[in-house]
Amino acid sequence: MSLLDPRQFLLPAFYLDPSTQAFLTQAVSNHKLGTASSFRISDILEPSPNNSTYSHDLDPSPQSVRSDLSTSPRASSPDRNSPMSKKSRKARTIFTDKQLQELENTFEKQKYLSVQDRMDLAHRMGLSDTQVKTWYQNRRTKWKRQATSGMDLLSEPGNLSAVQNLIRSSPYWANYITALPMGGQMGQMPMMGLPMPMIVPPAQHFQATSSSNSPSTHKSSESPQLDVSSNSD
């Protein structure tokens, strides 16, 4: 005579015989019954490992995306070390002393060359037209810069020492002042748009002497006025 299980009298609706319980337990372990091993609320709400793995496969994390991008080769970006990526630089022309002297002499006479003159000069010197054109452009830029610095110095009234230094250091201004009419004297010299009255003697007579302020100098400067007045009488 077998013993009776008291649970069959207490909960007849939920009572299962031992063979049925064994079958259900084996089915749960084999098929996971919807991937949940128990019917507790916490176990039901907890995501299953299979679902989490599937979600990771569909939605990779940003960190994994960044790592894939960093490790993947960039086929579109060119190699910086390759010779094709480097810009080709033109070789700088090295002029001989004779060529430079002839270019300087031509520039002193003519600051701007026509196309025909430039071609003739290039042919005569054994250079290309582009080389002569480039040299003239650079030389004009230097010439304009020197002229601008000279204008800035001359715009200061009474700056005689600066003018002397400028003439000694710049051949352009020495030739410019020497070539002025009336013995190199300027009555009204416009500098930077403003008239600046000053008298500049020729470059070869630019010497700071102590006798410039002597009484004899004033007498010599006043003597033409005395002669003019005597002739008028």
Swiss-Prot record:
Superkingdom to which the source organism belongs: Eukaryota
Renumbered residue ranges of the record's region Disordered: 50-93, 206-233
Gene Ontology CC annotation, any one: nucleus
Gene3D superfamilies the UniProt entry points to: Homeodomain-like
Pfam family, one: Homeodomain
Main location: nucleus
GO MF, one annotated term: DNA-binding transcription factor activity, RNA polymerase II-specific
Keywords attached to this entry: Developmental protein, Differentiation, DNA-binding, Homeobox, Nucleus, Sexual differentiation, Transcription, Transcription regulation
InterPro entries registered for this protein in UniProt: HD, HD_metazoa, Homeobox_CS, Homeobox_TF, Homeodomain-like_sf, HTH_motif
Subcellular locations according to the entry: Nucleus
GO biological process, one term: cell differentiation
Biased composition (Polar residues): 50-85, 224-233
Record-annotated DNA-binding residue ranges: 88-147
Role played: Cell-type specific anti-apoptotic transcription factor required for the sexually dimorphic survival of the male-specific CEM (cephalic male) sensory neurons during sex determination. In hermaphrodites, the homologous cells undergo programmed cell death due to transcriptional repression of ceh-30 by tra-1, the terminal regulator in the sex determination pathway.
Name recorded for this polypeptide: Homeobox protein ceh-30
Protein source organism: Caenorhabditis briggsae
Name of the encoding gene: ceh-30
